[in-house]
């Protein structure tokens, strides 16, 4: 429509059917223009054609009012093709004064021709012409419309309406009449609102409102279930309509983002347009508008947006922006509790991406991500559980501080349950989470004390499902259960001769020399390198070899090929020599070669790009089973570590990248930064920081880095390659602190195998040059050169080892380091001719030292020869019989740690014995030159386990009161722990040792506590063991009861009245205790006990007796005469009762103290099975103790109150004589009155002890103590002098003492 007038024309358009061009001026009448257009249409459109019309009609009525017959009427009519689509366009260059809407509306009211559809199907009330009622598509784009014609809403079959590129500010509310509308496009207009009536268009499939001025559009999509496309791009939206009801939505555009996905939401394409900011305008991130829009409401819970977020977070910059938005983080967390499984899965993927950053991970913990996580972990849907577990796995890995916050009692319980899930992938993810949590040292201490978790992992490691047993083995490796892991994967045991260690120096391309020496060792031994050594380590190029040989199990030929690739790809010249910068670089290189290295390092920077080197390392270290160092520990490979230098701390520290975890209890130095008053310090995880405290702490290190990262960090030689950085940590070449890592290898061996000696130590250098006169140069630069040479020298370590190791003749030390001028090549040398010279020098070195290579090969193959001899000797012995028990053959013996620690309890009733086995042990060790340390646990008065409590008054108000048993069957006390107070031997004590009168009440301990503080006796033991690393045997001269080993004792008063149920049960407890101890002569015990029918008989027979481990001393008696003349006697006893125990939980928390040590018990009763298992689970070699376990004293059920009031009337209290002389006379008189039936009974055998004037001990079986003393001495003689295995030593010692019953408990194989 132009402003000039011309005759109308009609042409056939293949896309639009027929196109009609009509020009008119603004002054023309709209009616005239409409008539002209209508006439043009009549001419242009095809002529009418014959159409058969079929019409069905009812004929006649039946009795019920229905139609009886149907009539068929057929006729032929002239009709035109129905009108389907109309497009109104404004020609380019037309005037802007008129939009032609009036012409269109008049044209729509006209009825140009008969309708093509039956008249009843059309709304007769419509003002639209009949022919227009068949229109399904109408386009009014680019017409300059200011208002949408209302007549358009009268088209009943309209499905597509296009109104793009107009000037519409609003849409008419009548648009809701278009019930069949499927596509509505109103892009590039000026809309500021959308009519509410649009929600009546329930059939919409596409709604496009791009590039308008919508701020808060009121769009109600609840009835538009079929909407698939929603475009709101380019609108200044402040509020996103609720799109959750749009389940079919697959295309979405918002602000500056366009989103298109496939039907299943598996593939999502996201396009983000950046804003064009001016030079002076502040730049905004591309997500600055999108992020607050979708995270302001719950719309992000839509599946399409959830998938979009995953796509967006693949970009590191996008993750950073979203991670800083707390509201966005909280919305993502809320998405994991969605009812839509796809949303949960995508939210977990997004959160996992975010959690890789430490700062965002801390933000997630601050937003309480663990609460919904624990909720979803209880879901019945395995897919949802797997998705959430992936978040847990990522969070636990990213940071120790985050991991420590994650491990709660509920989380641990949930993970244990999921480890036993029926779905293998759920099991695998749960095991990965447990393993990642164990990277944190504090978490590892907690997890290792979980007995059920340990047993579960041991069970899962042998499951037939490969992915489950690999994950279980990984968890055991991270927990530091190296021995359990070795036995589970049937790994090779450390030879009996001792450890075999290989260390390799740094040297860049000179590592070719190391490879050549290793080839000679491999040739002479006939075994691959990884089978010859238990520990392999290296620095820089030596570290790369250590990884290649020990972790990747490569051949030496493959290692040689790696060096050639290294020279070709990494160290090749990349800058043309005629280039000016290259020329400048060469000049600086020449300056370096003239001994000005320090200047070179400062000015020149890195010579080679690390990108190609990293690519080569990633290709070499790729592993489908996991790329972490610790994940190689499950493959039955040697222990391997690589030395680097952590330069992001001051001073720089050695850093050990290792493929193993230290056993729990090993003092470690954490390299995690902690902020204190604006400064950064390193946190120490060592057991104590006291002055003078012995610390054999491990170096800083990690087993959670990727394998290629370890090599890259160790090889970051200054000038040659850039430093290697991960997060805030930065590493340089390990040669700065340990170019010869042999000292580090010895330290790591001591930490891994504390009771195993080193048999063979092989150190290989990369070649050195002879000492020569230094050429003159710049004075200060020469000083820097000297300092660098000294720091990287390998000879200082060699000199120290050559001096010290001869003092340890059992260690065979071999050092291979050729000294030749041909070994002086550059670290990045790429000239093959110089490589050949180096190889020639090494070959000459090998030929000149044949005997040394022969000796080292013989020493390394000695374990293999011993294994073959053992098998040969085994065959004839068991050819016709059963095979030997593997448990016996693997029985441990005393290692190189040969000191003894003797521990005795404070106030022990055994300390007063005339003959005591502890004194005999001290004499034996003194006479045989065995270093013995003693520990007497001390407990301050009122010593309690550290926990706050509330005081309550004691029930005892006077020492002259009758006793009763509280009705509570179980009460937790701070000193005795959980005690059954209805047991006769566990009455709450009235302390006579100066303790507090009031007790403190504490809650039962939670499991597991975050920080466990051992109380005084246990702290003393733990510190003593940490200070004495050479202790190989821990002798616990402690009594045992059902709660554990008794560390200290205290005195109290106990009162019992007779006659009464309490007295009967007390007397029964005494008899049962005596019978349990006198098992070897029950007939004598029965004859003695037959004469004791009451407490009166008991105290007449003995003033002092023992119930279990508790000593009772008779003090006195009070007689009370009741109104019916019945006498009630109240007997008062002084008891020596346990006040502190070494419980299984305590043993597990002190796990590092027992590792590789032999535990010996020598009390009356042996330890309980729980105590033994705790020791063995904590790494003890063996536990030896009496076979008879402490038995529970029969329980007493109080019927009502057992207390009896003491009155002054009719009461006479008799205090028993405590003077020594009177006691002797009194005992002699009582023996005359009541003579035991058998003179040789155990009662009489111990009578002489009761007359001891010291009055310290009233034991009953002194003869047994003398035999125990002899037995202990014989046991130690077998262990130390004969070097017998533990079980064999015990058998030989028991052979001479048939009465004693002792058992040796060994770890399960």
Swiss-Prot record:
It comes from Arabidopsis thaliana. Keywords: Chloroplast, Hydrolase, Leucine-rich repeat, Lipid degradation, Lipid metabolism, Plant defense, Plastid, Repeat. This is Phospholipase A I. A motif (DGA/G) lies at residues 733-735. The gene is PLA1. It is an enzyme of class 3 (hydrolase). Disruption phenotype: No visible phenotype under normal growth conditions, but mutant plants have reduced basal level of jasmonic acid and exhibit increased susceptibility to the fungal pathogen Botrytis cinerea. Signal peptide: none annotated. LRR repeats lie at residues 155-178, 180-201, 203-223, 224-248. One of its GO terms (cellular component) is chloroplast.
